[in-house]
Amino acid sequence: MSEVIIDFSTFENRLLALRDRFPSFDGSPSSLVFILGSADEENPYQKTTILHNWLLGYEFPTTLIAVFKEGCVVITSAAKTRYLEEGVAQMNKKLENTFKIELWQSSKEPGHNLKLFEDLVERVREAGSAVGLATKDSYQGKFITEWKGVWDTAVEKHGLNGVDVSLGLSSLWAVKDEKEQAYLQVSSRGSDKFMNLLSDELVRAVDEEIKITDAKLSDNVENEIDKSRFLKKLSPELTPLCPKGEKFDVNYLDWAYSPIIQSGPKYDLRVSARSSETQLDGNGCILASCGIRYKNYCSNISRTFLIDPSDEMTDNYDFLLLLQEEIINNLLRVGATPKQIYDGAVNYINSKKPELSAGFTKNVGSLMGLEFRDSQFVLNNKNDYRKVENGDCFNISLGFNNLKDSKTGASYALQLADTVQLTSGGPKVLTNYTKSRSQISFYFNNEDDGTTKVKSEESKTASIPTKPDPKSKILRSKLRGESRAEDDEKEQIRKENQRKLHEKLQREGLLRFTDTDAADKDQKPVVHFKKYESYVRETQIPNTVRDLRIHVDWKNQTFILPIYGRPVPFHINSYKNGSKNEEGEYTYIRLNFHSPGTGGVSKKTEELPYEDSPDHQFVRSLTLRSKDGDRMADIFKQITELKKESTKREQERKVLADVVEQAKLVENRTGRTKRLDQIFVRPSPDTKRVPGTVFIHENGIRYQSPLRTDSRIDILFSNVKNLFFQPCKGELIVIIHIHLKNPILMGKKKIQDVQFYREASDMAVDETGNGRRNQMKFRRYGDEDELEQEQEERRKRAALDKEFRYFAEAIAEASNGLVEVDHPFRDLGFQGVPSRSAVFCMPTRDCLIQLVEPPFLVVNLSEVEICILERVQFGLKNFDMVFVYKDFTKPVTHINTIPIEQLEFIKSWLTDVDIPYTVSTINLNWATIMKSLQDDPHQFFLDGGWSFLATGSDDEMSGTSEEEVSEYEVSDEDPSDEEVDSEDDYSEGDNEEFSDEGSEDFSGEESEEGEDWDELEKKAAKADRGNRFAD
């Protein structure tokens, strides 16, 4: 309890409120006594525990609180007294003689506590014989045992009478102040978040047909509250809901009860229900409930999830929504009694759907707050002694049980529960997780619910199925209009969404850029004089120059020329180029230098500018001659090599300009460091391909090579932009891939992506041969063990995926919310060529990736401005995709040669992730487009922005005739993409489709088609037999 902070202002207000109210409690008690023994985590809703939390904000075990009209006595240990004494002293000083709080210290000394209890009993007896108690509370411990002995003696000796004050306490706690209402909002939002998590896990289990029990699924959700990564996500959302001056503290967030999941066939709609141990049934109705408490203030939410529901289920669920709305908006009003509320709900059912009244719950909720379910204020037809007040908070829970589907006969139940706060403005629902039928209904089986009628033998006519069969030719003829209408509707929705995305893109572009963002075409780029020095002082010049010969100083990047008997240094950066030639007995070398205004100034020379001034004089060239030809050739070679070295070093500096120096990796010195062994890394710091180990440390991860201790890669969590886990399904390797915010150095190489992988399978060898030696050598890979081998392979792959997934999640958890694991969706992938070869690209939640073959592809979708689909033409088998980024200085990303069959899917995917796209029939010159855009982005958007690409949009492409497209000869860098399709290029399905469309009007043409070889051979054989008999 080292971090206990008690709000003594709240303590004072609530203690005085208790002092003022308790004489009017049932039984008219003259004093109150509440004793708490050892903490009971299994039952946190006992009245004495709630009183501690209401007064102090904490539960103080082994503590007794006695309240009188003139004061209060607290008996507790010396350790707990330290948290109270300073605040209590200030309260006593403030209250003076009107009310006094006394702190009595208990101890473990024999007889000490008995003496305190006897003194207290004497005070109680003096106050009066009626003593208010929480008679239903049950605590254990030595402190309780000692008190019971003294109390029982006092009852017999002094005639003290204990009266139950549970109802009085309930009425005192019913109305919530602003602080309590804020805590209820925090806990309710927490319930929403955990219900969202529960629904995701539930739907995934049903969709993937995972074999799991209701209780096990409940445990999985319950354990999420212990994961810091999940809790840190909650902090930004829950902090604004906290009372003024308080910060959200995850340590005070806890379950009010274990999550409840019920998938039938039996349901329990009581708050005491438990998740069953039966397998999760993914049909019909699944009931789910979550309850979170923050600083001991409880909230509750229950939802019904409909899985492939019948019309009757959905109709009854819609009525349940209306019933809950009726209770909250019309029946739950200030001054109403629980009986009036419940009877009003029953009357509503009888007037609308009387057949449901038999299965209606026995109550529609209860008062809640520090106590999850206040038994003194249950909303049923028996409670007419309490009235709803402004400031009350209720768990409105209702449902129908023991329902039977008239079509299938299956049993099901429906339930809804929400936390509702009564405010001056009316009821306010604090739990906002969706309950709309469209959002909680899931359809995994699209086939007919009814059974197929058996066709009678007399009937020769086949009936048309109510749903088109994908394998039936009826799909492509009679029922073609059904699927086409559905596709047209989806297309219209997609076009409307794209129109909104383009309008949003144009608005944001105009807001993002102003006139000042434009570059002045007449203005030359501002250059900065690059200073360099060969020597600061003359004493640094080498002594060898005394011989008045040409010298090259490699250390200082300088060559020294003798001019008029003096050594003159020239830095290599001032040297431009040179030449050497021989004339007669002399060898000449000409040295050219950089200077401003030199004709033919290139981009490279501008990178080494000088300060241009009339006062400055420059040497543009020098010519030296000597009879020592070998010496001059050697000098010229050294100067040339020095220049090459300088240029190379400058280029490396430019390449590494965006490399940010990382902080040091803080190694984990305490506890066990998580590690993953036998890991290969790409790119590798070693020349040899050897497996190493990855460690998770305090602020990052480290890959350590086994060859050398200094051969390692350190990656800080703060520099991780994306963390991907890609399982080995459909691949030969399992991958953990890290995409960095800023590149890091590996030796002298700059890297932006680091990948850890392990091969998923060993080489399998199968040899034929009957030799005993061969059979022994390859006995596990023979034909007779093929099934066993495949099963073993699947098991290994599953274990490998599990190991890597756990390690990736461990990395994310160790980052304290800085990193999240992203997974690719293989079912949404497509083939493309982002670099040199065709690869399989897959979307993730936030990116489009290709991680199997280097160079890797990682496109962060949040950074994409627009996507352009190029070379979309009739007759072409593939198209290209270009991503333009919001940072216009960043090069665009190309993914070429995507199969044309993926076009509609990619359009839908781009729309789903809110990326606007346009369609073009040609490849665009992106270097020119991006340069003009960077020159004046404001004018670009004033002129319509990306609308200039709309000439190839879906609307226009749909109206383009086949002749118009065929007349255009596309200019493509890859002519192989535009070869004329042969007959083999058309699929069998396409031929069927064309023939089916014309089957009614041109059925007579089938006889004119050529016959296949089998038919011709049969005819030839028949003709031969006929000729033989004729002979």
Swiss-Prot record:
Q: Which residues form a coiled coil?
A: 478-499
| Transferase as UniProt keyword | no
Q: One GO biological process from the UniProt record?
A: constitutive heterochromatin formation
- Main localization, broad class: nucleus
Keywords for this protein: Chromosome, Coiled coil, DNA damage, DNA repair, DNA replication, Nucleus, Transcription, Transcription regulation
Query: Which chain regions cross the lipid bilayer?
Result: none
**Positions with biased composition (Acidic residues):** 953-1015
Composition bias (Basic and acidic residues) maps to: 450-460, 491-501, 1016-1031
| GO cellular component terms listed in the entry, alphabetical order | FACT complex
List the InterPro entries hit by this protein, alphabetically: Creatin/AminoP/Spt16_N, Creatinase/aminopeptidase-like, FACT-SPT16_Nlobe, Fact-SPT16_PH, FACT_SPT16_C, FACT_SPT16_M, Pept_M24, PH-like_dom_sf
Where in the cell? Nucleus; Chromosome
- Family membership, please give it: Belongs to the peptidase M24 family. SPT16 subfamily.
The annotated subunit structure for this chain is: Forms a stable heterodimer with POB3. The SPT16-POB3 dimer weakly associates with multiple molecules of NHP6 to form the FACT complex.
Function as written in the Swiss-Prot or TrEMBL entry: Component of the FACT complex, a general chromatin factor that acts to reorganize nucleosomes. The FACT complex is involved in multiple processes that require DNA as a template such as mRNA elongation, DNA replication and DNA repair. During transcription elongation the FACT complex acts as a histone chaperone that both destabilizes and restores nucleosomal structure.
Q: What is this protein called?
A: FACT complex subunit SPT16
